[in-house]
Structures are given as C-alpha cells and as structure tokens.
Amino acid sequence: MAQNIGKVVQVIGPVVDVKFQKDKLPKLNNAVNIELNGHTLVIEVAQQLGDDIVRCIAMDSTDGLMRNQEAVDTGSAIQVPVGKATLGRMFNVLGEPIDGKPFDTKDVVMHPIHRHPPSFEEQQTQPEMFETGIKVVDLICPYVRGGKIGLFGGAGVGKTVLIQELINNIATQHGGLSVFAGVGERTREGNDLYYEMMESGVINKTALCFGQMNEPPGARMRIALAGLTMAEYFRDDEGQDVLLFIDNIFRFTQAGSEVSALLGRMPSAVGYQPTLATEMGALQERITSTSKGSITSVQAVYVPADDLTDPAPATTFAHLDATTVLSRAITEKGIYPAVDPLDSTSRILDPKIVGQEHYETAREVQEILQRYKELQDIIAILGMDELSDADKITVSRARKVERFLSQPFNVAEQFTGTAGVYVTIGDTIKGFKEILEGQHDDLPESAFLLVGTIEDAVVKAKKIKG
C-alpha cells in the first residue's frame, strides 16, 4: 500500500502544520512521522484546518525541522507496548524503552493510546472498598476499588514512600500490578523513584512511563494516556486489579494549556484551555472498575499558589472519590505515614458501604483528635494540670490514637530497621476501638508509635516496662 506523504508548511515551536494531498487527510489523533537529524520525530494530528492542512503537536523537540520536509501518515494513533513485557521497564510517550536495557519487540502487543472508556454495561457500579493495609488510609479515607484518589502534599512529606508501599501491598497481598506515569516530573525524582523501587524489590510488579519536565508539552500531555493504556490491558485482558499512579495530574493540564493557544483556541479562565474539562474527563472516565478487573488511580495533585479554586485543581476534584492529605506538622512529630486524619476524606466513608462499626470508629477517632487540637492552646498556655479529668483522659487517648495511626512500612525497612506490616481493616477497627474505649489507658503512649496491630502495641509496652 502506497504511503500517504505530506509536506511540512509551518513550524511554531511544538506545533507543526502539514499539507497532504486532497482526500488523503490523516484522521484526528493519527501519528505522523518525520525523519529529522537521523531519528523519527512523531507528531500527532490535533486539527484539520481546511486547504488539506492538518495541525499537529510534536512529541519531541522540533529543533532543525524545516518547511517542505516529508511527513508520513502512519494510519493509526501513537501505540505503546502492553502486557508482561512492560513490567520492570521504563518507557517514554512513544513506548520506547528509556532505561538503557535491550527490548525485544518481536512478540510484544501494541495498543493505541486513544481509546473509548468502558460502556456503562461493562462498568461495575457497586462501590467496594479497596484494602491497602495502611491503617490511617483504610480507617479514615478508604479507597474505592476502581476509584480515583487525590494525594496532596508538599516536598519531603512522604508521597513517594506512600506510593511505594501501596505498590508493594497490592503486589504482595492482592497479587496485583502497578503502572506509574510521571507527568511533567523532575527527571531527578523519576530517577530516584526507579532506583528506590529496584532496592525495595517492587520494580518487577510495576511498569513505568515518563514524560519529563524538560520534554515538549505534547509528550507531557500524552504520557498519562500512555500509562493508562498499559493499565487498561492488565485490567481488561488479564483481569487484574491495577494501581495507576499519576504524578502530577496538574502537569497534564498545564501541558494542554501550553499548546492550546498555539492551536488557535481562545483561552478561558486564568488562561487555561477552553477544553480543560473535556480533556480531564477523557482521561478520568477511562479509570474505572469493570466486570473483569479494576484500575484504582492515585493522583498527586499540585495546587498552584495553594488556591483550591484554580480551574486545574477544581476540575480534578470533580473526579476524585477520596483525598489523602499529607501534613508537614505530622512528619515533625515523627509520625509516618504523615496522613492528616482531619483533612483527608472519602466518598465511601458511609455506614451503607463500609459498615456501621467502621464508620463510627472513624468518626470517633476524628472527634477525639479534633478535641485534642482544640485543647492544645490551653495546654500550651496553662499546662496539662489545668485540664478537667475528662479532658486529661481525652488528651491521653488522643495522643495514643495519633501515634497508633503510624505504621512501619515494608519499603522503608532498610532505613528504619523495623519490619513493615500489613494491617487488615478488621484489626485496624478493633485496635482503635479498644483505645477509644479505654482498654489500654495504662500503656505508655510510646508503645503505640510505629506498630501494626494493637497486639503489637501491647507486646511493645511490655518490652518498655521491662
């Protein structure tokens, strides 16, 4: 079959216009190849302008590209490898390995990155809790199987370690796989994550794909779709429960806004693209549970200037089922994971879904921590002695609850020297209930720090007492 060849007519940064023969225009989202400086530059069709010209977005640098160069329509969208061959490997937006190891493409299945979301009939509509084995997450902001979770936190509060522990737990306890999409990531962070995963041993259950900060907006826009396509294969063809990490979802929106004006669109609020909600919806609607398996997505959310009303985070919030907020104030107390139990939320923390006992225990934990927070000013000024007996008991139990929300992680074992633990939701509820009921008022609060179950705390207390 003869190749469909066009000619480059205009280059504006990452946006390239190509003229094709009449009646031979490539379809929207098709990949078009241009030979440039000894390698193939891939551009993706974004618009058909009339006069047989298509406007495309480049997936790599357009340095050195000239008018009248030949451009070949591939006839399909950008394709990435899927399946077992991707595990333990790192790819770019075009599905090319970037970890420096050989990659045999002979029997590898390739899938296009643009796909339709599952139909309503295929989706599983019954909300179901996804057990992570992390006490504070399961109790306070339980994740929905096939849901979307927003992970909020500044630098150095433990986002990466929490992500690694989730990858480890889904691999060891659920036999599941993970896909990590680095969207507009710092190259250094991606590099650190890769080597940390190799050290902690979870790399073989994970596929990684990166569109780094230094890459053109086209690559950063599409890398989330590349990662999602890899995850969809594990869900649909292998019936797996998959964890999909997107770090950072804001960069996906940011990349879209960078090319929006060059594509000739009028900017909307705060200079964002007018198609913001559509682009976000196209990505998020593909992340769901089906009758075959599920994709549960954890998305790191950067909030520009801490303004939650900014259109980018505000559009993301509309899709989230749960939010996990990491707090620097909690890391300063030495409590890890540093999840803020008063700021984190979940749509399924509802007695109809998680059960009455779970719901009541979670709410009581939040109530006692809130009361402790209110009393802290009094304690700071007047000291503990000025509190009523009831408030003294509240403070004592709240401090134990606060410490019991911490837990040793498997992936941090080489730093802490403490073996990590996976705690079932039943054990989690039982432990917090016993503390709230006052069954462990006689134990020192240090016994509750970095332990798994309540039985572990009792054993630790005996060791402390000698």
UniProtKB/Swiss-Prot annotation:
Enzyme class, spelled out: translocase
Location in the cell: Cell membrane
Binding-site residues for ATP, renumbered to this chain: 153-160
InterPro entries: AAA+_ATPase, ATP-synt_VA_C, ATP_synth_F1_bsu, ATPase_a/bsu_AS, ATPase_alpha/beta_chains, ATPase_F1/V1/A1_a/bsu_N, ATPase_F1/V1/A1_a/bsu_N_sf, ATPase_F1/V1/A1_a/bsu_nucl-bd
GO molecular function, one term: ATP binding
Chief location category: membrane
PROSITE patterns registered for this protein in UniProt: ATPASE_ALPHA_BETA
Its membrane topology: Peripheral membrane protein
Reactions it catalyzes: 4 Na(+)(in) + ATP + H2O = 4 Na(+)(out) + ADP + phosphate + H(+)
Pfam family, one: ATP-synt_ab_N
GO cellular component, one term: proton-transporting ATP synthase complex
EC number, as in UniProt: 7.2.2.1
Keywords: ATP synthesis, ATP-binding, Cell membrane, CF(1), Ion transport, Membrane, Nucleotide-binding, Sodium, Sodium transport, Translocase, Transport
Record entry for activity regulation: Inhibited by nitrate.
Record bears the keyword Isomerase: no
Subunit (UniProt): F-type ATPases have 2 components, CF(1) - the catalytic core - and CF(0) - the membrane proton channel. CF(1) has five subunits: alpha(3), beta(3), gamma(1), delta(1), epsilon(1). CF(0) has three main subunits: a, b and c.
Similarity annotation: Belongs to the ATPase alpha/beta chains family.
Its job: Produces ATP from ADP in the presence of a sodium ion gradient across the membrane. The beta chain is the catalytic subunit.
Protein name, as recorded: ATP synthase subunit beta, sodium ion specific
Species this protein is from: Acetobacterium woodii (strain ATCC 29683 / DSM 1030 / JCM 2381 / KCTC 1655 / WB1)
